[in-house]
Curated annotation (Swiss-Prot):
This is Arp2/3 complex-activating protein rickA. Homodimer. PANTHER family: PROTEIN BNI1. Residues 444-477 are annotated as: Central and acidic domains. It comes from Rickettsia conorii (strain ATCC VR-613 / Malish 7). Residues 313-441, 461-517 are annotated as: Disordered.
Amino acid sequence: MVKEIDINKLLAQENNALNTILSQVNELCKQNKQLQGLIEIQNETKELEKEHNRSLPWFKRFVKTVSNVKYILIKSEEQLTNEAIKYNNKILKDIDNKIYNIAEKSAPLKQALQEEIEKNFKDLTKKDLSKDQRARLSEVFFSYKSKPERFSALHMTNPLQFINAEALEKQYNSLNATKQNIQNLISANSNIKELKEIQKQVAEIRAEVPHTFFEKLNNIWQNVKNVFVNNSEQVLAKNKESNTRTIRKIDEQLYKTKHKFEELIENKERNIKDIIAKLPDNEKLQKIVSNLTNHMASQKEPILANASLAKPLENNITPPSPLPENNIPSPPPPPPPSPLPENNIPSSPPPPPPPPLPENNIPSPPPPPPPPPPPPMAPAQAETLSKPIESTTVKKLANQPRPSIDTSDLMREIAGPKKLKKVEFDPNTGKPVAHSHSKPAQNVNALSGLESIFARRAVIKVSDSSSSESDSGNWSDVSVNRNKSKMLKTKGERDAKMTTHAQKINNRNSQNPSFVR
């Protein structure tokens, strides 16, 4: 009966916060009015707003209404868009946080909230829901519940990670009760101005880790006691006895909480040492033990985890190579140079391979000749330059591409309008070899152009020379042909000889390239 009275007082104090939650539920029903069942819930919300007596039965009806809203939204998620689902989840999460903040101010109200949530969850899961929908509803109700495991997910300094956080949950509830007692004490002595300022600081302590919650609450409580000591004349006579009992009770609660924290930490330290003792020797484990010992010796100094992890890394880093005198880092060592000849002059690179012949089998003109090699150095200079030459690299010119020379115009001028014929030379004599498959010369009358003119001139010259030789009787012919009798040739014989000579000239002209178009 006493607990229910305290709950009713708390609900009356949180009237504005409850009205805000009801307006959010009403707005959520309006945004999703197309879903079946939300209109009835909206009517229930309006009836809850009209009731001014905020009691424990009213609070249970209120929690059941919110649970029904969650059930309808999860059952009808297929009818909603992704944006609507995100918006609904955001509003529901805000509603859950506000309800839990109200309930955590009173341990009986918090217990009643948990019982009502479990009851509603069991009733709703019995309805027509699929397996996925039941899992989704469980997730929604899990965020709505208060479980001890929620403290195991909080970020705490190693090695203060508590897997089983039931003891911390008890300390957290005890600190909430102490906080409520301090607020009641300040409200009973509201005539003291200094306490009104402290009351705001107490109300600002929210969602803290138990240990930091204790530190903040303990510091504020010391200030409250100082105010009572310094302003004892302002304390009303009717409140002196109750103030004394309340102050003694709060001191005992804070002392027990602090002692329990120390006991939890010592037990955890002992468990960690027992686990480490069973493991094989390891430098990393020894560093963890030393860090744990330092943390327990001085709680004011945090564990320098980053500094301890940086030490083994320093040993693995290779020291940089020392810089030379001019503080310029030396370049990487060059590859070994090619061996030098006896005169210490690097040999010229091998000549590049000849380019392939074009289709007409005529080689392209050779590239320009390379520059002449430098004159040989004196022996003294060669000795002085021999050392730095060993440390330098000789660039190979063989890998460099040859300069491209455009010979298309030149080849066009050489080839002319007619295709050139391939000429083969005898390797022994160096003279051109006549092909057996070449066509015989045609009649002189078939010649045309300049070739026929050259042939006539050659015939005239031959006829003139033969007639002059036969008429004059040159001494060279007599000396060479002493044993032969001098015979005169007829005109037919001379014509046959001239025809044979003209054919030879024609064959010679056809084999040589013509530069006349």
